[in-house]
Structures are given as structure tokens and as C-alpha cells.
């Protein structure tokens, strides 16, 4: 039985029996896109596939450094969690169809979970939005693309160095280098194979401009699956590199001395029959596409909360940094905020 073909609780039980798994790893995506989770005994996990389980709601109230968010001009009654609530468990559902092999842990499958009834769960919110779109006869596909610096450092060594004078994986500026990805083909192939084994295959992988910079483009999928794959890639690529005594850094601008790093979201809309709404034989730029771009422009300020969520994000958003600083769009134009691909 293929773990990627599980559809219900009975399928999960049959699979766990077939691979003799006593424990399962479960993770939830928090509001910063970080996977938070734990090991679960198979008996508890199997019950959870049918009736859900409780998970501490603090993961939707603290930041990536486990500090509680402090929101100005917001009353306690408006906050989802905090000292005033006592940080209770909230009902969480296993996403059965998200099951994957975990290449780093034999016989311990990996599953995602979500808070379907709460408006603070990123995956739950996305599912809700996709459902509203489908009611209007629209489906969407997406793909994520990440750039990251790779260092020959460990979580301990970067702290000992006070996050300065870090050793880059490779020196100098050399985008799209065949030389470098051939010299270091073992590591590149480890990443390619990891992604293939976890069913988040890469469409492309290459060096980017900067010392030790790598760019990975994840293959297109339905938007909920694409979002899952994006989170999984960031987490498990870091696992791979740390096991190799290296660190991947996805910060927007870790140093003023080097280029910044981007995360690109590729998006498209289709009708319920799978026909593209962004291209027709009659129109080079259909109205649906133009309205889509216009909507992105209109709400760009609000989107910035998600696209540029940290102070560091704005160190990247400056002229000449290959990052958009206004709400422009263009056809095959990499200098704009929104690039229409033909």
C-alpha cells in the first residue's frame, strides 16, 4: 500500500499494520509557516484519524522564537490565545491524504494536521478559501520557488560567531553554475532525492547569484498541496543540511554585503474542467487574468503582512535589490511585483 494513496482512517490502519509502525510523526503549520509537532503512539494516532485530537493552542500565539505576540490596540477578548485563556488544547484533525515517508526515520510515517474550525490555522484558512472559489466554479494551482544561502556552519557555531563571519558553502557570485553543482553533485542529488521520496519533486534546482546561494523550484500542484509542499521543503531541506553539518538560511536579507533571497509564488486559475482562465485563443490577456492582477495590486498592502512578515523583510525591499518596491506588473518582466508569464 502506498502511503500517498491513503483516503480514510481504515486505509491508515492497514498501512501502519503493513509497515509495522509503532509511532507516527504529526505536524501542524503555525502562523509563521513553521511546522510544530510531535511523535504519537499509533493507537492514539489511529483514534485521532477518526475523532481528532487536542493540541496546545500556544503555537498560534507565539512567534518563531516562541515569544508571545504582543498586538497593539487589540483587547484580550480579540486574541485567540494568551495568558488570559490558559493555553488550552484545541481540536485538531489529521490530514490523512498528507501521509508521507520520512526518509530520516525508518518506519515512522509523517502526517500533517490542521485546525479546521479555527480561523487562525493557515491550512484551514486556505482550505476555506479554495472551497469558496470552487463554489464559484474556479480552481487554482500554485508552485513555490525558494532561494536560500547555505553555510558550512551549525546552529551552535553561528551563535558562537555571533552570526557574523560565517563560512559560505561556496565562494563568490556564480548563478546557474554547472561547475559548482557538478563539483557538489552528491549534495545536490541528496536534496533532489529527498524531495522525490517525500513527494514534493523539484522542477528545477540551481545555484543563484551569491556565495553558497541555491534556488529550488517545487513542481506545480493544486494550491493546498502546493502550500503543504512549500512548508515541507523548507523544514526537511534544513534537516538534510543540518545532518550534513550545514545550515540553510531563508532570510530575506541576512547581510548587507550579499544579495537578498526571494520566495516566489506562481499561481494560475482554472475552471472546474481544468481549462485555464488565464489564457484563451481569443484573447492574449483575458479579463480574468487582468482582474486577478488588479486584485493583487489593490490588496498588496494587506498581502505584505504575509509576504513580508518580519523587519528583515524590509531590508530587502529597496531599489536595485531585485525585489519589488511598488505595485507594478508586466509581461515576462522580472523587475515588477507581478510577472505575467506567457
Question: Where do the language-model regions lie?
Answer:
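ATP/Mg2+-dependent ligation/transfer catalytic cores
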Residues: 1-204, 226
